[in-house]
Amino acid sequence: MKGFSNRWNDFPDYIIGITREIWEDRGIATLHHYYSPDIVVRSPSSVVIGNEKVIGATMATLAEFPDRTLLGEDVIWSGTPEDGMLSSHRILSTATHMADGVYGPASGKKLQYRIIADCHAINEQINDEWLIRDQTAIVNQIGWEAKAYAADLIAREGGPENAARPLTPATDQPGPYKGVGNDNEWGGKYADILRRIMGADMAVIPEQYDRAVQSEYPGGTTGHGHGAVDRFWMSLRASFPDATFAIDHQIGRSDAMMPPRAAIRWALHGKHDGWGYFGAPTGAEVYVLGISHAEFGSLGAAETAI
């Protein structure tokens, strides 16, 4: 790969390799090389600029969870080494809450949770990132209710006026990556499925998902079958019935020894004015950042499905 060390076999090898090097091998200082000085890292809870802040956050996490592992489940990617590549990296993380930190007093609880990180890299350096961590899964396993944890964190940050601002179109910062993915058919297929779901066409679920589909959701929840898919998306959309749904990035891939798969980064922006996943309507303006992965295949004579 042009601009990358020949130690990497391909782009997924680079992404998985530097993740292990930074976290598990304690090569935190390598972030000066692997992350650009002015990188923009967006998560639902904040927008962070600069690799120095990333280094500080990494050290704080490892102080609280010193045995953390990051197991790469998949890297769905697009682009070229010459123009830059975007990876959507799905991780299953394990950790023990061994020290006091942002998640409260040490609980000794063993955790398992997922993260998806969309990272743009060129010349062996990441310069733009969108990061989603399953915070509900983390706090629930420690012993918090998600709402109580959020309220406690806001209080510790100095109250609503002083707490970190969540990601919204108003707080987002521009980064160097301007791409929208690729035109692979599997990315297009998954994007169409999600648009139909967000357009209230829930009949697409039994039509396009295998009846034995396994699905993973926030809170560390695993579902099986059409019902779980329907319940999650119905409940989410019902909470924001008039919100605008947008697909910001889509990737599809067909790789040897792998099923066809897709990664979609999407946003839902509008008022919380419906009953659903988040309880009684509050009228609050909400911006939801989401990243979804899907694998496609067929069983017997069945049509290709998720």
Model-derived segments and their meaning:
Residues M1-I306:
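C-terminal and inter-domain tail/linker signature
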